[in-house]
């Protein structure tokens, strides 16, 4: 199992009841995907295991999962803070021009005039648009608004993002 091709979709927040149910916080914009899962990969501190989904219920802001082989609260407690993952091939397709955050993190960011700025290290979700955090050896931390006027191209195969800096975003 190649963990480089796995994507986190939930985090285990605790147990529920005595029969081995696990409380999961969704880490996806598509929690409805949970109802279509037959199996998931549980990552507990780097140790991976595949588990069949025996039951699922929505509960407040959580989802309650019942997995094959996890039948008691004692066994379930061993998965506290574990991560539910799926293979990258199982991701929902996004419209053209949209990307999952994990696909953008680590891209080299190039300005059309200044050349290489640095690496996209984080994404801040705001109400209006995302903001990309670029770690630049030359300019320090640069905050780039994820808007069409700024983002010119995203080339995942080349691990490259091309942008047009707005005036005032960095000091010359």
Curated annotation (Swiss-Prot):
It is found in: Cytoplasm. An accessory protein needed during the final step in the assembly of 30S ribosomal subunit, possibly for assembly of the head region. Essential for efficient processing of 16S rRNA. May be needed both before and after RbfA during the maturation of 16S rRNA. It has affinity for free ribosomal 30S subunits but not for 70S ribosomes. Pfam families: PRC_RimM, RimM. One of its GO terms (cellular component) is ribosome. This is Ribosome maturation factor RimM. The PRC barrel domain binds ribosomal protein uS19. One of its GO terms (molecular function) is ribosome binding. The keyword Cytoplasm applies. Binds ribosomal protein uS19. It comes from the Bacteria. It comes from Syntrophomonas wolfei subsp. wolfei (strain DSM 2245B / Goettingen). One of its GO terms (biological process) is ribosomal small subunit biogenesis. NCBIfam families: 16S_RimM (TIGR02273). Belongs to the RimM family. Keywords: Chaperone, Cytoplasm, Ribosome biogenesis, rRNA processing. Residues 96-169 form the PRC barrel domain. The gene is rimM. InterPro entries: PRC_barrel-like_sf, PRC_RimM, RimM, RimM_N, RimM_N_sf, Transl_B-barrel_sf. The keyword Cytoplasm applies.
């Amino acid at each position: 199992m190649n963990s480089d091709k796995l994507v986190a979709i939930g985090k285990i927040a605790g147990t529920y009841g005595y029969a081995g149910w696990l409380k999961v916080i969704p880490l996806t914009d598509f929690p409805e995907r949970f109802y279509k899962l037959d199996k998931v990969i549980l990552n507990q501190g780097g140790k991976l295991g595949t588990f069949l989904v025996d039951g699922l219920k929505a509960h407040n802001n959580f989802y309650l999962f019942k997995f094959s082989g996890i039948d008691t609260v004692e066994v379930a407690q061993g998965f506290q803070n574990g991560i539910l993952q799926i293979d990258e091939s199982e991701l929902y397709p996004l419209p053209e021009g949209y990307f999952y955050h994990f696909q953008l993190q680590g891209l080299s960011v190039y300005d059309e005039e200044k050349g290489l700025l640095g690496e996209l290290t984080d994404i801040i979700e705001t109400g209006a648009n995302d903001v990309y955090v670029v770690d630049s050896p030359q300019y320090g931390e640069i905050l780039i608004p994820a808007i069409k006027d700024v983002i010119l191209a995203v080339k995942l195969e080349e691990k490259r993002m091309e942008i047009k800096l707005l005036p005032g975003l960095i000091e010359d």
